[in-house]
């Protein structure tokens, strides 16, 4: 799929796919279970299945990406960071700027992952 046509849901579904792949290898790894629940919650908010946005402020996907997966599973860290980026904008009631769109904060974060 062309990055320019990506939607917030594409980022979330991709993250869930990666998490489920990791869970198939390590089914009892609790961090993957926590990440999956949090990403699924963001998906449910985005689709309207869940209307309670109060938990968006309590998500720790970004911290999980940086502290737990950045050095051991860069792909999963990138996906969690993308979902965290989307969720943090949703929590603030902002129009969501997707990670691939030109945004200085996103570009800084991507440089950090490449180095």
Q: Model-found features: residue ranges?
A:
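Short terminal alpha-helical segments
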Residues: 1-36, 107-114
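Serine/threonine-rich low-complexity intrinsically disordered regions
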Residues: 2, 7, 30, 52, ...
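Generic structural signal for well-ordered, non-transmembrane alpha-helical segments
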Residues: 6, 10-13, 33, 37-40, ...
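Amphipathic alpha-helical interaction modules
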Residues: 18-70
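Amphipathic alpha-helical binding modules
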Residues: 59-115
């Amino acid at each position: 799929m062309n990055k320019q046509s990506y939607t917030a849901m594409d980022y979330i579904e991709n993250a869930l796919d990666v998490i489920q792949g990791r869970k198939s290898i390590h089914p009892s790894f609790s961090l993957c279970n926590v990440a999956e629940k949090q990403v699924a919650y963001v998906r449910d908010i985005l689709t309207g299945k869940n209307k309670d946005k109060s938990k968006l402020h309590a998500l720790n996907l970004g911290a999980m990406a940086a502290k737990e997966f950045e050095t051991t599973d860069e792909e999963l860290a990138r996906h969690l960071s993308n979902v965290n980026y989307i969720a943090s904008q949703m929590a603030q009631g902002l129009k969501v700027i997707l990670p691939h769109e030109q945004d200085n904060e996103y570009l800084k974060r991507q440089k950090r992952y490449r180095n």
